[in-house]
């Protein structure tokens, strides 16, 4: 029970299970794992796919002949295991050239380098069968406002994304581009901070239909926002192209904790939302094992992410099927035809009728919504004492 299978569409990045445990205050505590070994290990655990940055697979500066050998060896592992590569992304944050931005660098040569690196990563992803290209603007931010750069960066990023979308069309790549917001880190402030800001920006692009979102649990939580609401907004806009699942304590650095390890109630309602919405994309765990762990702990972390998701899925489905929950929700969502007749699309007649209508406000002011009981039922399902 709760055993992951490929049909659950769970994915991990090479950088997640491959995280060596380095942090700003300490060196690596684990050896780098061979990407081919990671592919075989994830397949053993029941994962659907593996995602990657360009440099996770091909170290920066690798000669072309060696690059081709690496790709052939990696593709062989994919063929042997059946694992997919649903998503790729370019590392536009590690190279010192990107210290003041990649697409938003004030130096046009750096912007050109970032764009070329992105095109090459798109080529790599196409070789591996990827259909989603994530753009994380981690270095696209500032600590100093004296430059006035905040007035210029939108044009630079728009230019780069429009170029990438046109390149994808010209090459016959079927990419959907998923933009990943984050409020800060590594920059003091990142220009594309939240799901809402990314949604607004997408509509300024030449091909907005090719662009959507890759929201991350930790990133919205860092800003003190409600991730379930952010994902619901992305779903409503038809823009949830990909999702990063992890966990996070509010107002901390980006912790990338094991999914469900901190905000269990939020994780419960996130799984409830994803599973009830018809979302068909990957469930990607952008997290990593604690620095305390050896390799065995890394795979315990990976198993834990998937197992927690499946437990929450089962608990959420049972919660929604509970007769008392259904009864409470039926009472919560009132469908009074007289009130509904005053709502909906505008007409002059409806506006006049609305102004004339006698609204039962006294009764509505006294109404109770039974949310305490409904929420308690959710808690009891989470605690495993009901259903």
UniProtKB/Swiss-Prot annotation:
Entry's localization field: Cytoplasm
- Specify where it is mainly localized: cytoplasm
Q: What is its EC number?
A: 5.3.1.5
Pfam families from the UniProt entry: AP_endonuc_2
Catalytic activity, reaction form: alpha-D-xylose = alpha-D-xylulofuranose
What's noted on cofactor binding? Answer: Binds 2 magnesium ions per subunit.
The top EC class, named as a word, is isomerase
Which InterPro entries has this protein been placed in?
Xyl_isomerase-like_sf, Xyl_isomerase-like_TIM-brl, XylA_actinobac, Xylose_isomerase
Supply the alphabetized keyword list: Carbohydrate metabolism, Cytoplasm, Isomerase, Magnesium, Metal-binding, Xylose metabolism
Instruction: Give the protein's cofactors.
Output: Mg(2+)
Q: Which GO terms describe its cellular component?
A: cytoplasm
Q: Which residues bind Mg(2+) 1?
A: 180, 216, 244, 286
Write down the superkingdom of origin: Bacteria
Q: How does it assemble?
A: Homotetramer.
Q: Which HAMAP family match?
A: Xylose_isom_A
* Name this polypeptide is given: Xylose isomerase
Q: Which organism is it from?
A: Thermus thermophilus (strain ATCC 27634 / DSM 579 / HB8)
Name the encoding gene, please.
Answer: xylA
């Amino acid at each position: 029970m709760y055993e992951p299978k490929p049909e659950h569409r769970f994915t991990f990045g090479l950088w997640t299970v491959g995280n060596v445990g380095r942090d700003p205050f300490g060196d690596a505590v684990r050896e780098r794992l061979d990407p081919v070994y990671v592919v075989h290990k994830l397949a053993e655990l029941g994962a659907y796919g593996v995602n990657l940055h360009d440099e996770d697979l091909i170290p920066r500066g690798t000669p072309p002949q060696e690059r081709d050998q690496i790709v052939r060896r990696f593709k062989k592992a994919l063929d042997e295991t059946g694992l997919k590569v649903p998503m790729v992304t370019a590392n536009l944050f590690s190279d010192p050239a990107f210290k003041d931005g990649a697409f938003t660098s004030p130096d046009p040569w750096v912007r050109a380098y970032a764009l070329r690196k992105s095109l090459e990563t798109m080529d790599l992803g196409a070789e591996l069968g990827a259909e989603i290209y994530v753009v994380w603007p981690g270095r696209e931010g500032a600590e100093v406002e004296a430059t006035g750069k905040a007035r210029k960066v939108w044009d630079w990023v728009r230019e780069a994304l429009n170029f990438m979308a046109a390149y994808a069309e010209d090459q016959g790549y079927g990419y959907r581009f998923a933009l990943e917001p984050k409020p800060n880190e590594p920059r003091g402030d990142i220009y594309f901070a939240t799901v809402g800001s990314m949604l607004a920006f997408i509509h300024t692009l030449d091909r907005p239909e090719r662009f959507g979102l890759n929201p991350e649990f930790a990133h919205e939580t860092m800003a003190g926002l409600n991730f379930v609401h952010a994902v619901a907004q992305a779903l409503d806009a038809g823009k949830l192209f990909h999702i990063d699942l992890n966990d996070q304590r509010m107002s901390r650095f980006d912790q990338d904790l094991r999914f469900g390890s901190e905000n269990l109630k939020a994780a419960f309602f996130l799984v409830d939302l994803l599973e009830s919405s018809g979302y068909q994309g990957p469930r990607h765990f952008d997290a990593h094992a604690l620095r305390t762990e050896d390799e065995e702990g890394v795979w315990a972390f990976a198993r834990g992410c998937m197992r927690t998701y499946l437990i929450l899925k089962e608990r959420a489905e049972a919660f929604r099927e509970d007769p008392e929950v259904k009864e409470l929700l039926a009472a919560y969502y009132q469908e009074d035809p007289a009130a509904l007749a005053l709502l909906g699309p505008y007409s002059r007649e409806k506006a006049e009728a609305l102004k004339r209508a006698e609204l039962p406000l006294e009764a509505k002011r006294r109404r109770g919504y039974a949310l305490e009981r409904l929420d308690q039922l959710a808690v009891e399902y989470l605690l495993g004492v009901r259903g």
